[in-house]
């Protein structure tokens, strides 16, 4: 396992019996001075050493010192280098502590090494490399990341499935099952398709899954998944019984655009163009539906996401605002409807923030009037929590993300994704005139402040890139890779793989002081129409993309 000689850690000390190393008897015979009066177990105290005069590096000592690499043996007589009683002892070379892989039996009578060029030096070199974080013994995933980067760098279009626009329409969303065994396709013409991503074989078509466009698909586990549609409903499905729906959920009054799921509480969270965020208790679902409650309301709602640990909820709007609910508690908010406003950043005026009395939550609007619930929510903030420096639960932050090169205030945030480890958020923004598009990465700063107004924003722009301005009026869904090191973004008639640097490092390892461009790792073009959605497989080195003309393409490494 280790490229060492017979004295490597874990090796047998007897295997090196023929090596030319001094034995304890030879070392003892070489000693010329009287033995030290101190012996193991003696209770004596060394006097404090006096100030030493400076000595040139490498100057010879008064008595021969042991060779580099030799360690003293317990119970062996002291050499002549020991000073007489009452005299200060010269400083001894520091003893290096053996690593955890060194076993006691390998420390036999030869010690750990016998010189600078012996196996001991190689051992200490290996320990140094390991302490610096190099090699598989510290972080095996580092080499795995290098391998994945190499694989994605050699990725090519592997297969494609053409879906007739007459029967299926455009591809609006793609979603893999958590185990990567099923790829689901949300189609424009009321259908959901299921494929085997490994063989590219069609498994099942859920004809008339909805009565209008299917917008989003979300897996709850390896067998249950949910779909939402412009028909204002959400449907639950079971992969083991696809002939009928598990149940249909009614509660929205307009197009339902995306679905989130809290695995800890088993609560389903949906959002739609009616401005409502609704929570569904899937623990008590029946054929007629399941209990639900309006959790939040805001105007111009586009997308809603939960962080991986479900500690934050992010909501993007077509007016350029990003709403962040900190210290999220979905279960508590079913009874408590107060949302203290922590801060408003880069808003046009203080009157832009109002609270909807029907949902007891603040919303962004152009109305100059305030509802009384906004002031009452601040009164409900615990004074004790303010004194102790603790933010209230479900506290709201309103942010206008900084976009480099924006010509006018207020960009439409059309797509919203979160880093798999919750470090950052990924936004795709378009200008008000719809003539510019860009992808931006924002790092989450420290937790939300306690004071209602703070000069610091919790999001910081770290990376950005300009996108192709094609397919106006359609939302382009981008995504992070499962490890969070790469981004797959629709780009014209294909996709681009983007990284934070050329080595595809993790975000925390390459955070710039100022916003810097994303690096293009690879560009892939295999469609004949505008790509609307793309997705990484959670288990395989595979990417899927879907376009406006109904074509689904799969990308895999090719050597």
From Swiss-Prot:
Skewed-composition ranges (Low complexity): 56-86, 350-367
The keyword Nucleotide-binding appears for this protein: no
Keyword Manganese applies: no
Gene3D superfamilies: YVTN repeat-like/Quinoprotein amine dehydrogenase (2.130.10.10)
Chain intervals with Basic and acidic residues compositional bias: 370-381
Record-linked PROSITE patterns: WD_REPEATS_1, WD_REPEATS_2, WD_REPEATS_REGION
InterPro entries: DCA10, WD40/YVTN_repeat-like_dom_sf, WD40_repeat_dom_sf, WD40_rpt
Family: Belongs to the WD repeat DCAF10 family.
SMART domains reported in the protein's UniProt record: WD40
UniProt entry keywords in alphabetical sequence: Methylation, Phosphoprotein, Repeat, Ubl conjugation pathway, WD repeat
GO BP terms in the entry: protein ubiquitination
Pathway annotation from the record: Protein modification; protein ubiquitination
Protein name according to UniProt: DDB1- and CUL4-associated factor 10
Disordered: annotated segments: 1-119, 350-396
């Amino acid at each position: 396992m280790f490229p060492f000689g017979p004295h490597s850690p874990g090796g047998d000390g007897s295997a090196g019996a023929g090596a030319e190393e001094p034995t304890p008897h030879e070392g003892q015979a070489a000693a010329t001075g009287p033995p030290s009066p101190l012996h193991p177990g003696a209770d004596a105290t060394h006097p404090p050493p006096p100030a030493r005069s400076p000595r040139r590096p490498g100057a010879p000592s008064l008595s021969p010192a042991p060779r580099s690499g030799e360690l003293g043996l317990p119970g062996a007589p002291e050499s002549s280098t020991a000073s007489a009683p009452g005299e200060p002892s010269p400083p001894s070379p520091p003893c290096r502590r053996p690593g955890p892989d060194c076993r006691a039996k390998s420390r036999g009578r030869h010690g750990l090494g016998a010189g600078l060029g012996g196996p001991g030096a190689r051992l200490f070199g290996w320990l140094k490399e390991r302490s610096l974080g190099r090699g598989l013994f510290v972080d095996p995933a580092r080499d795995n990341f290098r391998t994945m980067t190499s694989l994605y760098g050699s990725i090519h279009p592997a297969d494609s499935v053409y879906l007739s626009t007459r029967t299926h329409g455009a591809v609006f969303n793609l979603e893999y099952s958590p185990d990567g065994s099923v790829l689901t396709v949300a189609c424009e013409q009321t259908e959901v398709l299921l494929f085997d991503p490994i063989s590219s074989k069609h498994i099942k078509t859920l004809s008339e899954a909805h009565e209008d466009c299917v917008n989003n698909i979300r897996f709850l586990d390896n067998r249950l998944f949910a779909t939402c549609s412009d028909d204002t409903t959400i449907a639950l499905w079971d992969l083991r019984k696809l002939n009928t729906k598990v149940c249909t959920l009614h509660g929205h009054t307009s197009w339902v655009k995306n679905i989130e799921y809290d695995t800890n509480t088993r609560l389903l969270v949906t959002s739609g163009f009616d401005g409502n965020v609704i929570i569904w208790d899937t623990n008590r679902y029946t054929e007629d539906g399941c209990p639900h409650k309006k959790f939040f309301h805001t105007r111009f709602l586009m997308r809603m996401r939960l962080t991986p640990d479900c500690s934050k909820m992010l909501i993007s709007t077509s007016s350029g605002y990003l709403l962040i609910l900190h210290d999220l508690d979905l279960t508590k908010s079913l009874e408590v409807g107060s949302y203290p406003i922590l801060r408003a950043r880069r808003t046009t005026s203080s009157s832009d923030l109002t609270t909807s009395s029907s949902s007891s939550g603040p919303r962004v609007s152009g109305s100059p009037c305030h509802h009384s619930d906004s002031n009452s929510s601040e009164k409900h903030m615990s004074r004790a929590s303010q004194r102790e420096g603790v933010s209230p639960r479900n506290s709201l932050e309103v942010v206008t993300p900084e976009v480099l090169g924006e010509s006018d205030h207020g960009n439409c945030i059309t797509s919203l994704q979160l880093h798999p480890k919750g470090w950052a958020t990924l936004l795709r923004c378009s200008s008000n005139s719809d003539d510019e598009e860009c992808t931006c990465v924002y790092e989450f700063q420290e937790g939300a402040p306690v004071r209602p107004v703070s000069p610091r924003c919790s999001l910081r722009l770290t990376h950005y890139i300009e996108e192709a301005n094609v397919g106006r009026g359609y939302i382009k869904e981008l995504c992070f890779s499962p490890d969070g090191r790469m981004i797959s973004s629709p780009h014209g008639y294909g996709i681009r793989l983007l990284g934070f640097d050329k080595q595809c490092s993790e975000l925390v390892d390459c955070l710039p002081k100022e916003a810097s461009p994303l690096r293009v790792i690879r560009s892939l073009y295999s469609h004949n129409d505008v790509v609307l959605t793309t997705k990484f497989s959670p288990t395989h080195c595979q990417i899927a993309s879907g376009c406006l003309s109904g074509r689904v393409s799969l990308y895999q490494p090719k050597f």
